[in-house]
Amino acid sequence: MKYNFDKQISRRGTDSYKWDSAESENVLPMWVADMDFRTAPAIVDALRRRVEHGIFGYTRVPDSYYEAVTGWFARRHGWTIDREWIIYTSGVVPAISAVIKALTVPGDKVLVQTPVYNCFFSSIRNNGCEMVSSPLVFASNTFTIDYEDLERKTADPKVKVMLLCNPHNPAGRVWKREELVRIGEICIRHDVTVVSDEIHCELVFPEYRYTPFASISENFRHHSVVCISPSKAFNIAGLQIANIICADANRRAKIDRAINDNEVCDVNPFGVIATQVAYNEGEEWLNQLIKYLQANFLYMQEFCREHLPEFPITVLEGTYLVWMDCHRLGIHSQELEQRLVNEAGLWLNAGTMYGTEGKGFMRWNIACPRTTPVSYTHLRAHETSAHL
């Protein structure tokens, strides 16, 4: 079956955070990381059947849910997950916060690689910890890791956790196995637990390969915690569901207590159903989605090369979040964000949301029907008329 990702569906008036937060209907929102596609039809059908039942009481997590999760990762990624390693939770962000709470005490340090997903910052701060950054190195329109800096920062005995983003948001990198091995070896050497946010793991372009951090070796498995969810890949973030994978029994017990302390383990019946259907029946839909997203990126890349050479974009290996270099404009990212909204009707994320290393960059969500990138024309017209 061929799925139609070109279909335009209005999300206005649905209390969409992405669309209904705009001050004007003339603003095109390409900021928040969700997609403007309907989810897989099999998921819609399963949810419709559940709604027709009409009773939405307290729900348990069935055996079939765990079988769907473990089956998917074994089949698609070659990662064998024991059921007992899985901790159900209501989202990756609550999961990360609970894991930090479980593995640190106030005053400890947590390391990140900026620019990085901004919710990492609040999760660290809300648990009374100090953030330490080992910035990524930007060159030739891509990002790499400064291993010497990472080694130096993790050697601080106050650093207890490293938050890894794999694939990386907003850099668009899908970390190679050898890169993850070097990260893991450094962290194990300094007794730092790697907490890997792998929510974008299904959104990897065919030329690249996602490696689950905990799958690399038994040693890595027991020194890491992985957070996963079908929400990004299948566009079901509103159903609030995720899983923590932790093989180490001692860490898992601490995390389980923190999850319950934070009260983020209540079961959403629709999330449970959607996850099972996504993993059991959604693979072909996902494969077609990935091809469509890559075609969107190639379209955007070519458009920018031809019409907006002053706006180079990073090489996108995975996710649907393009990182645009706007340094040549000499405008602060937050000012540029506001000017694009006011003058071009285009809402992007200021790079500084993701750390000071994001200065001069903008993040652009391209998970939309290909007819939507009239937004590129918005940007071109703005650049031409206003000279930015």
Locations of the language-model features?
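N-terminal small-domain helix-loop-helix segment of the aminotransferase-like
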Residues: 2-91, 98, 278-281
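Helix C-cap/helix->beta junction micro-motif
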Residues: 127, 189-190, 220, 344
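Conserved C-terminal alpha-helix-loop-beta "cap" of PLP-dependent enzymes
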Residues: 311-312, 324-363
